[in-house]
A protein has these predicted regions:
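Loop-centered beta-sheet repeat module
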Residues: 194-204, 215-233, 239
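Non-cytosolic membrane-interface motifs at loop->transmembrane helix junctions
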Residues: 40-47, 216-226, 283-291, 349-354
């Protein structure tokens, strides 16, 4: 029996890179490292909104996992699958959380120089005394529970909240991927629309409620933004997109020029959506413009890239872009501690230092990713060698 050819979409590696860079630039901006760009009114919304927010990672992951588990007969043990996926990123999350904790202890200590050996104890005690629930915060981040109760602790390595919601997504992946194969095309299109309902209701609740039990609007927004059960529907939307793609509903994108035109239109729509949010609108409406609407646009942009045609898709398929893109979730986890440390070394608010920092983050991440690939190939070759004896 001939083995089925696996689904592979090279341009999506470049999409990962684009989304990752946008998130890193967002946090550079929030740390005041991009103040020199403040006069560029047509660029800053891309960074500050951002144009490609965390939701794109969920749509992309849902699509890719649906493609990997496209065999309806494949049985996937849920618990091993969940922990296998999380373990690939948790080790890095753990070390970055510890690093960020130590960096914040030093920052809050008031020391302006690296403490000598005899000063370490005093520096540590002074920093802890000025932090809010430091040990509880560390525990919440290490156990991936901070995103559930973010108001109970400080934010350490904040982007790690996504690991919690991905853990929930992975829990339903085996079941939902098998269930999708049993559904008719009509049901798939119904799902295409109805999966947005929870996010819209969440936006309405956000806009119609007061600050609830939160101390401030910002604390409330952070909770609504990282709430894992809502993020799962973005992931499922990505899975539904793959099934619709496999059923041939997007084959028209394979025609000459159609893919390129579609990519241009979707990028223009994503950019235009950034200007829909306005201070005078109800917060729930702005939340919808920032969370629900982009998910649809991200999904359609993703679909337009799949045939590999068009200028954007061809750029995303360049070897070096794909190589860096495959490692792009590592910058997502490591950039905040590195930005915090960099501010203690130099002034990040200048173009040269911004570029150098980005080069450092993505070089380290790519080398780490390539090392893991090399180690995996080496272990596989050794296993094959031993089995051949």
């Amino acid at each position: 029996m001939e083995k089925a050819k696996p689904n592979y979409f090279p341009a999506l590696d470049g999409l990962r890179l684009l989304a990752s860079i946008n998130i890193v630039m967002l946090h550079l901006g929030s740390s005041s490292a991009l103040a020199y760009m403040s006069d560029y009114k047509w660029i800053m919304p891309i960074v500050n909104a951002p144009a490609f927010a965390a939701g794109i990672f969920y749509v992309l992951a849902g699509f890719l996992f649906a493609s990997k588990f496209s065999d309806p007969e494949r049985q996937i043990p849920v618990i091993p699958f969940m922990f296998a996926r999380i373990s690939k990123l948790y080790r890095l999350h753990f070390f970055m959380t510890i690093l960020m904790f130590l960096v914040l202890v030093f920052k809050f200590s008031g020391y302006t120089h690296l403490p000598g050996f005899s000063e370490i104890g005093d520096c540590f005690a002074a920093g802890l005394a000025k932090m809010t629930h430091p040990w509880r915060s560390l525990f919440l981040h290490i156990t991936l529970t901070w995103s559930i109760v973010p108001d109970l602790g400080m934010k350490l390595n904040e982007p790690s909240w996504s690991l919690t919601s991905f853990f929930v997504c992975y829990a339903v992946t085996p079941w939902f991927s098998r269930w999708l194969f049993k559904q008719s095309n009509r049901t798939l299109w119904v799902l295409f629309g109805t999966l947005f309902i929870p996010g819209i209701l969440w936006a309405a609740f956000f806009g119609l409620s007061d600050n609830l039990w939160f101390d401030s609007y910002d604390a409330k927004y952070r909770f609504f933004h990282i709430f894992a059960p809502v993020r799962i529907f973005e992931y499922l939307f990505g899975m539904v997109l793959f099934r619709l793609y496999k059923e041939g509903f997007f084959d028209f994108l394979k025609r000459d020029y159609v893919g390129g035109i579609s990519q241009f239109v979707m990028l223009a729509a994503i950019y235009g959506s950034l200007f829909l949010m306005r201070p005078e609108l109800n917060p729930g409406i702005n939340y919808f413009f920032h969370h629900s609407l982009p998910i649809l646009l991200y999904g359609l942009f993703l679909i337009s890239l799949l045939p590999g045609k068009g200028g954007v898709a061809r750029f995303f398929c360049i070897g070096i872009v794909r190589k860096i893109g495959r490692a792009s979730f590592y910058p997502y986890l490591i950039h905040l501690p590195i930005i915090t440390i960099a501010w203690g070394i130099c002034n990040l608010n200048c173009p040269k230092n911004t570029i150098l920092l980005m080069i450092f983050i993505y070089t380290v991440s790519t080398l780490y990713s390539e090392f893991k690939v090399w180690r995996r190939k080496k272990a596989k070759a050794k296993l094959q060698e031993n089995s051949a004896k």
